Structure formats: C-alpha cells, structure tokens
Amino acid sequence: MDHFRRQMRAKAYASDAEVLHQLAALAPSPEARAEISRQASAMVARLRAEAKPSVMELFLAEYGLSSEEGVALMCLAEALLRVPDAATMDALIEDKIAPSEWGKHLGESHSTLVNASTWALLVTGQVLDAPETGMAGLLRGAIKRLGEPIIRQAVARVMREMGQQFVLGQTIQKALSRAAGFEAKGYLYSYDMLGEAAVTDEDARGYHMAYADAIAQIAKSASGKDISSNPGISIKLSALHPNYDLQHRAEVMDVLVPRARSLALLAKSAGIGLNIDAEEAARLDLSLDVIEAVLSEPSLARWDGFGVVVQAYGKRAAYVIDWLYALAEKLDRRIMVRLVKGAYWDTEIKLAQVDGLPGFPVLATKPHADMHYICCAQKLLAMADRIYPQFATHNAHTIAAVLHSARAQKVTNFEFQRLHGMGEALHEQVLQEHGVACRIYAPVGHHSDLLAYLVRRLLENGANSSFVNQIFDAEVPAHVVAADPFEKAQEAGPKISLPADIFAPGRRNSKGFDLSDPEVLAHLQAQRVRRQTWSYGDLGHAHPVHSPATSDQIGQIRFLSADQARQLAAAATPWQITPAERAAVLRKAADLYESHAEAFFALLTHEA
C-alpha cells in the first residue's frame, strides 16, 4: 500500500500525456470505441425523440456559459455568496443584468418557466438601464430606486429557485418524503447534507450532529437486506474539522477520525452505505490517512457499506483506486467506490498557477478527463471482487463505455448515479433498457446553503462543451454530443499556461511548494533540523547571531564600517544608468533565492 502512496505523490503533477500513456492498456480498442459511439448516439437520439428534459437542463441549454447572459448569471450566482449588504447587491445586480441582451432569449425555450424567467430578467434589465436625463429620466430613476428592493428580492428568489432544482428538500424528512416517488420506480438514493467546510469547531460539531440525525432518519427507509439496495449518505471530512489540512494532521487524526468513525458505526447499524466525498486535491493524501484509520476500526469488520469518492479528473485517480483495492484486501472487505468526473477543476487550475506549483493536479482538458474516467472505470470493473463500482455521470458516451466494459468483463454488480435534477431521462433509459441500478445523489439543505452547491453544478454543466448543456440542443447533432473523447483529444484546443509560464514571455512565475505533500514537508523539515552555521558578509567585523529560542549560535554576520558604506554608495551611482545589467543581476538574484529556498526557510525558523 505504501508503494501506491509513493507513486501517487510522485505522479501528482505529471503531464496529461504521461498520465494517459500509463493507462493506455485500459483504453477501449478502436473497434470498441466505434461501437460505444454508435450506442451513445442512439441514446441521445432516443432521448430527443421521447424524453422530456428537466427545467434545469432546458435552462442550461438556453443560458450556458457560451452566452454572455449565461456568464452574467453564473457570475451573479457566485458573487451573491459574498455580498455583504443591500447596496452592494443592488450594484452587482445592475452590473450583471442591465447590460445583457435578454430579449434574444425570449420565447426560445420549450419551458414556460425558463421563458418566464427570461421575461423577468428582460424587464429588470430595462428598469436598471434607464437613462438619467430629463423628466422621463427622473421618473424612471425614481422607479428604479423604488424597485431596487423588489428586484433584489426577485433576483435572490430566482437564484434560490435555480438551486432548488438541484436540492431534494430543506430537511432530511422532506427529502425522504419527496424521494418516495422515484424509489417506487426502482431508483436508489444517496443523501448529502449541504454545507461547506467547517470554520470553527462549533461548526464541525453541528455538522456531525446533522449527519448523525440524517443517518437515523434514513435508517427508517432502509428495508433492503443488502446495503447496495438501501439508501446511503455522503459526508465531507472538511465539515468535521475546522483545520482539515496536512499541517494539522495530528489534530485531525485525534479529533476528525473518531467523529467519522462514529458516523460509520451508525451507518453500519442502520444498514446503509456511507460515502466519503472527494474534495480539493490538497486534501487527498490526508483523506486517505483518515479513511484507513476509520476502516481499520475492528467494530467495522465485515461491513461492506463504506464508500470513497474518486475524482477522475485528478491525475492520481488510478493510484487511489489501486490503493483502495489493496486496503480492501488487507481488511478483507468490500469498498464502494463512486467514480465522478470532479467538481473543483477551475479552483485546482487557478490555485496551481497562483502557488507556482510544478504542474496541475488535474487533467487540463475535458476530453482527457473523459478518457481518464473510462480507463478508471475499466480498472474498477476488473476489481469487482473487492470494489462495488458506482459510476456517477450524465454523459451518454461514458455510460455506453461502462456498459460495454461491464459486458466484456461479465460484471453485473455495479450501479450508475446521477445528481438530483440532472440526467433524469438518460438514467431512466439505462434503468429500463439495461436493468442497471441507478442511484440519485440528493443534496439536502436550507436556502442559505444552496448557492455554493449551485455554482459548482452550473460551472460543471454550463460550459458549451458540456454534455448536459448540449443534449437537448437540436442544433448540435447527436453524434457530436456523444463524440468519442479519444478522438476529440486529438483536436487542438486552447492551451492552459502551466504555473511556471503564466507571466511568459516576460518572466517565469516564482516557484512554490506543495505543502499538502508529506514528502515535500519532510524535505523542508530535514533542511530545518540539519546542523548548519551561516556566515554572511565579506567585509567588516564578525558578530555572532543566536537563536532567540535556544540561544544556540546559528552563524555570524559582518557589518560594514561607515567608510566602507560610503565607498559602496559611491560605486553604486553608475548603476542607475545600466538598466539591462541591473535587470540581469536582479534575475540572477531571484534565481539564487529560489535555488536556495530551503536554506532560507531553515534560517528563518532559527532566527524567528
């Protein structure tokens, strides 16, 4: 198992090409890919001919991220999370809604609700964009001022309504009641209590209690003899501890592990599954430590209801799957693995660039992520003796690829999953025609918790290349919607600058350190504790420097005399008229700082 963890760390920032090359043996053959594409195209054609799309699918088709109006709505939804007061909210709404051309969308959707929303946005934009001159302008200005509170409430209501398309209920009781209709059709559920990472320990205790209460309520619906036929729950580890990062590992293992373990024991007693949700890449290594510690609890022996979510866009996904299989063998049990595409792509790309990391922890293009998903799915199906595969996708091509691989490997014990409010018609087709179990991932929470979840879903599915965005768009042919990602990957798309190159050609970005990698931290720590004395300066009298913490001498420094300082200042005068040489020296100094960063860190910790 340690072998897989070492590989995982070594390949965290490998190139997309290297990651996919290592999984080439798992990729479908050209003949299989052709058959998969045919089946996927047939699925899409049948959906368009027979199915009724959901409101959210119609909304995304009309207002995807390919339109200025769609971008405005995404920005508005995301920014409303951080608006501190009514005045700022009014300014934000005016900035995002007034300039957009809502009229061109009027009457374009098949949904009355979507068209009504468009009409409301059009009227709002006209009020906010009123000219401010003349008597008419004064009158319209008054209407604008009087209308701002109403508009503010209306926009918040629209955002809330959008969020409710994705949320099953505000309480677990309401969600369970609403789920009964789909359960009667043969669907299963996995409930997710909405909420972002805990900020305080009080938050964490509150989330823990909410999870425990939800498990108790879900248990009442768990009538099946097998865990895979019962509802389940998903939990976020970041909700159970306010400092869920590697720098607080000891505290996390002491506090978070018992909390997660207690929830697992409750789920075991209830006869339901419990999945650990995937989060940002920086938390992956620590999450595996927590997962192993929880699953190693003797009282959880012979329980096959523990699950882990793996994000296929992550470059380490295949190694995580190998590690989970090894853990299942070690503990002699079966682990559920939910394979998802991934929900934090934009964040991961931006953080890697800002932090100057060696590369990206995620695959840089959607076709590469789709290819990786298919290869990881093949791996999971081959491990079905210890893994219960759960394939979360709304993409017809991905579903066709999984079905093809399952038939080839003669694996029947797996399930598909979809988000509540998304992919309903596609999964209904899979359930009815292929007899494969389908589980609905159902968020549960209050209005105050909706927007962050909504933004992630819209960013995932709102892009013009998204399957969900295109599936009911008649202008996009079925074979294009269900295109083979292995072929699409050959097309040259926009290149995302690597972290080191974001300021090119002017200069290279400064180098950062992945402080979520235990091996990076161990290297920095080794430099810090290594006995070393530093000496700086070539002129003047030497003065010893001591650590303020231990009084040990850590080196010496030489100070210039007044005469020496005057001589250097005089010599520096011509320096002002040689910008090229000065720039070269500064670049050289920056390179030296970077190449000796570990020594500087060590010195700083001794002198602090």
Residue ranges and their predicted role:
Residues 469, 473-606:
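Short, structured beta/alpha segment
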Residues 1-508:
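Positively charged, amphipathic and often flexible ligand-engagement surfaces
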